[in-house]
C-alpha cells in the first residue's frame, strides 16, 4: 500500500483512535505494518520495542506461529457458529482447559469477545444470581476509585476514573466507590502494616452503611492499572474475600490485564492466594490474535442457572461473537503456548530482573515509587522523592517521558505522573536491558528539559 497515502492527514482524519485527539495524532502518526516477538515495525521501516504488549494484551508475543496456525486451521473448517443455537468443538475444549487452570471451583465459563463485555456480564450475573436465590434487593456494586472496568455504560459506572466518565454522566444508579490501597499515597494518611489494612475495612463500613442486603458484588482489579500499577498490600485481597463471604456478596476480579501469566501466575488470584467468586478474563486470553474474553464462576453460582427451559433461570445475557470458534481456537493455542513454554515462570523471573533494573532510575532524583509483580511494572514520578511532592501538572512529566521513549523506539503506557511497562512474556534479558536503556535515556532528556 502507498505509505504516503496511509499517513496523509486526509486519510487519518477519517479514523477515530481510542482516547486520542486525531488532530494531534496526524502531526506524527504511528502506522504499524507488522510485528514479531516483542517488536513492531511501522510503515517507514522503523522498529519499536513493544513495552506494553500492545495494550497489556500480546502475552505470547507477536507473530506466534502456534496461534496463527491454529486460527488458520479453524478458518478452513468453520469461521462462525450460531451462538443462540449451538456451540463448537474449540469452544467446548477451551472451557474445559480453562477449568483446569482457574483457581478452586471456578469451573463454569461464559465466553465473550472483549473486556468490557466481561465486566458487564460479571455484574449482570451477580445481580441475576441474587435475584434467583431469594435476594432480589441485592443490586448495588462496590468498586474503587482509580479503577477502570471498561467503556460500556455498566462497566463505566463501576469505573472510578473521573476523566474516563465525566463526559457520559450521569452513569447508572447503584454503583458505589471506595479508595484503593494506594499505600505510597494513602488517602487516610496511614502506613502499612500499622494501618491493619484500613482501606479494606472501609469496604465493610460502606456495606454496613448501605445495608448488606442491598449489595450484590464488589468488583476490583487485583493489581490496578489506572493510577500507576496499584499493588495490593499483603492480606488486602484475603480481607476483602472474608468481608464478601460474611455478607453474602459476590467478589469479582477484573483480571482482563492481570490474567494469563502477567503477574507470574496464570491468574492474579493465584499470585495473591485469594479467590473471587467471578473472574473476568480477556486481552492475554488470546494474546490479541482474535478478540476473546470471558468470565469464570463458582460451581455454586452456576447451579443457580441450571434448570429446564420452562424454569426461565438461564443467564439472560449474550453477544454475537461470544464463543466464536476462531477466537476459541486462538485461546486454546495461546493457553498451550503459555503452559508449554513456561511463560508464567518466565514472567516471574524476568519481572524480578525488570524491577531490579528500574531501581537504577532512582539516580535521576525523580522516582517516587516502583510497583508491580511479574511482567507488570509501574514507576511513579515525583518532583521530590523526600517529600513525595508531585510535579507541577503543567509539566506533564510522565507524558513527556513516554513520548520521548516512543521517539526513541519504545512503546509504553504513560500518564502525567507515572509510566507502566508490561512487555510480552517472551521478552529476553537483552531486550529488557534495551527497554530500560531507552527509558533511562528518555528520563534523562526530560529531566534536563524541565530543569533547564
Where is each model-derived feature located?
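Conserved N-terminal phosphate-binding loop of PLP-dependent enzymes in the Aspartate aminotransferase
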Residues: 2-452
Amino acid at each position: 500500500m502507498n505509505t504516503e497515502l496511509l499517513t496523509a492527514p486526509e486519510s487519518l482524519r477519517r479514523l477515530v483512535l481510542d482516547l486520542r485527539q486525531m488532530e494531534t495524532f496526524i502531526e506524527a502518526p504511528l502506522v504499524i505494518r507488522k510485528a514479531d516477538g516483542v517488536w513492531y515495525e511501522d510503515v517507514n521501516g522503523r522498529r519499536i520495542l513493544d513495552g506494553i504488549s500492545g495494550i497489556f494484551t500480546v502475552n505470547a508475543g507477536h507473530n506466534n506461529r502456534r496461534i496463527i496456525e491454529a486460527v488458520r486451521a479453524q478458518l478452513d473448517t468453520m469461521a462462525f457458529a450460531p451462538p443462540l443455537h449451538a456451540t463448537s468443538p474449540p469452544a467446548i475444549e477451551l472451557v474445559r482447559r480453562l477449568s483446569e487452570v482457574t483457581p478452586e471451583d471456578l469451573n463454569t465459563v461464559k465466553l465473550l469477545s472483549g473486556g468490557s463485555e466481561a465486566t458487564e456480564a460479571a455484574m449482570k450475573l451477580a445481580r441475576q444470581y441474587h435475584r434467583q436465590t431469594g435476594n432480589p434487593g441485592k443490586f448495588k456494586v462496590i468498586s474503587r476509585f482509580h479503577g477502570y472496568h471498561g467503556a460500556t455504560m455498566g462497566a463505566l459506572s463501576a469505573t472510578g476514573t473521573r476523566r474516563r466518565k465525566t463526559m457520559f454522566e450521569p452513569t447508572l444508579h447503584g454503583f458505589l466507590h471506595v479508595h484503593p490501597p494506594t499505600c505510597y499515597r494513602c488517602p487516610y494518611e496511614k502506613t502499612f502494616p500499622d494501618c491493619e489494612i484500613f482501606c479494606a475495612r472501609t469496604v465493610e463500613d460502606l456495606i454496613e452503611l448501605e445495608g448488606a442486603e442491598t449489595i450484590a458484588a464488589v468488583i476490583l482489579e487485583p493489581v490496578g492499572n489506572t493510577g500507576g500499577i496499584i499493588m495490593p498490600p499483603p492480606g488486602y485481597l484475603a480481607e476483602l474475600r472474608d468481608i464478601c463471604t460474611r455478607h453474602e456478596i459476590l467478589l469479582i476480579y477484573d483480571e482482563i490485564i492481570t490474567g494469563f501469566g502477567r503477574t507470574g501466575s496464570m491468574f492474579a488470584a493465584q499470585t495473591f492466594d485469594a479467590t473471587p467468586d467471578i473472574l473476568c478474563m480477556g486481552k492475554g486470553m488470546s494474546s490479541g490474535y482474535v478478540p476473546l474474553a470471558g468470565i469464570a464462576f463458582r460451581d455454586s453460582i452456576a447451579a443457580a442457572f441450571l434448570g429446564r427451559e420452562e424454569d426461565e433461570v438461564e443467564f439472560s445475557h449474550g453477544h454475537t461473537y461470544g464463543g466464536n470458534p476462531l477466537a476459541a481456537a486462538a485461546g486454546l493455542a495461546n493457553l498451550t503456548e503459555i503452559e508449554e513454554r513456561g511463560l508464567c515462570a518466565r514472567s516471574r523471573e524476568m519481572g524480578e530482573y525488570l524491577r531490579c533494573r528500574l531501581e537504577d532510575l532512582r539516580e535521576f532524583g525523580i522516582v517516587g515509587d516502583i510497583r508491580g509483580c511479574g511482567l507488570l511494572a509501574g514507576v511513579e514520578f515525583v518532583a521530590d522523592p523526600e517529600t513525595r511532592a508531585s510535579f507541577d501538572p503543567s509539566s506533564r512529566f510522565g507524558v513527556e517521558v513516554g513520548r520521548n521513549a516512543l521517539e526513541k523506539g519504545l512503546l509504553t503506557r504513560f500518564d502525567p505522573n507515572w509510566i507502566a511497562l508490561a512487555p510480552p512474556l517472551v521478552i529476553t534479558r537483552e531486550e529488557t536491558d534495551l527497554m530500560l536503556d531507552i527509558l533511562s535515556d528518555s528520563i534523562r532528556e526530560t529531566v534536563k528539559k524541565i530543569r533547564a
